[in-house]
UniProtKB/Swiss-Prot annotation:
InterPro entries: Acyl_CoA_acyltransferase, GNAT_dom, NSI-like. Plants silencing TAP1 exhibit decreased susceptibility to the pathogen Phytophtora sojae. The gene is TAP1. It is an enzyme of class 2 (transferase). The lineage of its organism: Eukaryota, Viridiplantae, Streptophyta, Embryophyta, Tracheophyta. This is Histone acetyltransferase TAP1. Residues 88-231 form the N-acetyltransferase domain. Its EC number is 2.3.1.48. It comes from Glycine max (Soybean). It catalyses: L-lysyl-[histone] + acetyl-CoA = N(6)-acetyl-L-lysyl-[histone] + CoA + H(+).
């Protein structure tokens, strides 16, 4: 089957295709990842592990520019020995402060970027998904500590394509499945908006992470091409 035929069949079957850019040994290689049918079916049935949110078909509308539906819910809740309650809140409503984002980037060791550009990137994103830790001390009404611990964002043409960028989780919260949940729910939000062709960029050390989420490399040998200035 030709790649064009594959894309057409995927479009009519609502099977999203996901691509991933890999950087290996200082060279940049583009990998295309097709979402496995089992993952898609689990999303459609709302049975994805650790997800309490049901997927709904987006309502029909005549408006050309429909903004993504904002979703906020508790992903994790735990009580510490001293009675402090911590909740991890997932949000797709773009509630990310640029200074908090810069601090999170510092924690994961990313190079600093100008605050004005960070603010522009957030403003111009189609979806900004975030994870916040909210801690409530025992017996202290109204006294909450809110901290950004994870983020991923997506840009889109609002019709067919979206690209996931800047996936990061606070090192103190890594290894708890939060990055996996963040990506799964961001994908789910995009699918709710009928965005079926999703791309992302991945460093070599996290390729397996995306494979475990159901990504498959290079369908039909598709490669990405990049242009860089010579000076």
């Amino acid at each position: 089957m030709s790649m064009l035929s594959l894309l057409r069949s995927q479009l009519f079957n609502f099977m999203p295709i996901i691509h991933c850019l890999l950087k290996l040994n200082s060279t940049r290689k583009f990998k295309s990842f097709q979402l496995k049918a089992g993952f898609w079916e689990s999303i459609k049935s709302g049975l994805m592990k650790n997800n309490s949110m049901q997927v709904i078909d987006p309502p029909s509308t005549d408006e050309e520019n429909v903004e993504p539906l904002s979703q906020d819910f508790v992903l994790v809740e735990k009580t510490e020995p001293d009675g402090t309650i911590e909740q991890i809140i997932f949000s797709s409503g773009g509630d990310v402060d640029v200074y908090d984002l810069q601090a999170l980037c510092d924690k994961v060791g990313w190079p600093r970027r100008p605050l004005s550009k960070l603010a522009a990137a957030l403003k111009n994103s189609y979806i900004v998904a975030s994870l916040h830790s909210i801690r409530k001390s025992h017996g202290s009404e109204g006294n909450e500590q809110k901290r950004l611990i994870g983020m991923a964002r997506a840009t889109s043409d609002h019709a067919f394509n979206a690209t996931i960028w800047d996936v990061l989780v606070d090192p103190g919260y890594q290894g708890q499945g939060l990055g996996k949940a963040l990506i799964e729910k961001l994908i789910r939000t995009l699918l709710q908006r009928d965005i079926g062709n999703i791309t992302l960029f991945a460093d070599s050390q996290v390729v397996e992470f995306y494979r475990n989420l159901g990504f498959e490399a290079d369908p039909e040998g598709i490669k990405g091409m990049f242009w860089y200035p010579n000076h």
